[in-house]
Amino acid sequence: MWRGRAGALLRVWGFWPTGVPRRRPLSCDAASQAGSNYPRCWNCGGPWGPGREDRFFCPQCRALQAPDPTRDYFSLMDCNRSFRVDTAKLQHRYQQLQRLVHPDFFSQRSQTEKDFSEKHSTLVNDAYKTLLAPLSRGLYLLKLHGIEIPERTDYEMDRQFLIEIMEINEKLAEAESEAAMKEIESIVKAKQKEFTDNVSSAFEQDDFEEAKEILTKMRYFSNIEEKIKLKKIPL
């Protein structure tokens, strides 16, 4: 106890034992620099501090901020970076974000905030659509791992697969009845379900080459799905 009191007296009188390091008080400049690494609000200049991921508005002046260019779609939509996505949760997050950043809510705000709301809304729409569909979600996940599939490529597809695609396309071209169309739709739907299950397993095992091959096949069948939709539209 005496040593504690003695130490307190030494601190009050301005003395300190030789060889014992003293804590230097944080200067005003140092204190201000502590937040200099954080992004600052374009409107008031205030620092955001940690936890920016969930902030769209400045905590000081409540001005809408610019979208974070480093944030990926999974983070934005509050999803794990995985091929398996809870689509109900994804839709809820989409609606939540649009209630925050949709341009309709910024008609009376500054032009800067109007521009930011347009960018946010577009980004949220793109993220939602990309993560909702298995094919676009898989391609995006591959891209995050540094792998991209060119738009027009056979990606060394085996001959048997290409023959299968050709035969389905021929059946579609010749289909004249509703029953024939439904049969082709059923085949394509079953194939896409099989591919979706397989690519999910490939991602879980970090087998990106396998995922790349399956996604390429999914893209072929996605093209057939689009042709089916077009053929259903009455001319």
From Swiss-Prot:
Expressed in lung, brain, stomach, spleen, ovary, testis, liver, muscle and heart. Transmembrane segments: none annotated. One of its GO terms (cellular component) is mitochondrion. A divalent metal cation binds at C41, C44, C58, C61. The keyword Acyltransferase does not apply. InterPro entries: HscB, HscB_4_cys, HscB_C_sf, HscB_oligo_C, J_dom_sf. Keywords: Chaperone, Cytoplasm, Metal-binding, Mitochondrion. Changing C58S: Abolishes self-interaction and interaction with HSPA9 and the CIA complex but does not alter subcellular localization. Residues 72-144 form the J domain. GO terms for biological process: [2Fe-2S] cluster assembly; iron-sulfur cluster assembly; primitive erythrocyte differentiation; primitive hemopoiesis; protein complex oligomerization. Changing C44S: Abolishes self-interaction and interaction with HSPA9 and the CIA complex but does not alter subcellular localization. Pfam families: HscB_4_cys, HSCB_C. Changing C61S: Abolishes self-interaction and interaction with HSPA9 and the CIA complex but does not alter subcellular localization. GO terms for molecular function: ATPase activator activity; identical protein binding; metal ion binding; protein-folding chaperone binding. Signal peptide: none annotated. Gene3D superfamilies: DnaJ domain, HscB, C-terminal domain. The keyword Repeat does not apply. Pathway: Cofactor biosynthesis; iron-sulfur cluster biosynthesis. It is linked to Anemia, sideroblastic, 5: A form of sideroblastic anemia, a bone marrow disorder defined by the presence of pathologic iron deposits in erythroblast mitochondria. Sideroblastic anemia is characterized by anemia of varying severity, hypochromic peripheral erythrocytes, systemic iron overload secondary to chronic ineffective erythropoiesis, and the presence of bone marrow ringed sideroblasts. Sideroblasts are characterized by iron-loaded mitochondria clustered around the nucleus. SIDBA5 inheritance is autosomal recessive. Belongs to the HscB family. This is Iron-sulfur cluster co-chaperone protein HscB. It comes from Homo sapiens (Human). The lineage of its organism: Eukaryota, Metazoa, Chordata, Craniata, Vertebrata. The gene is HSCB.
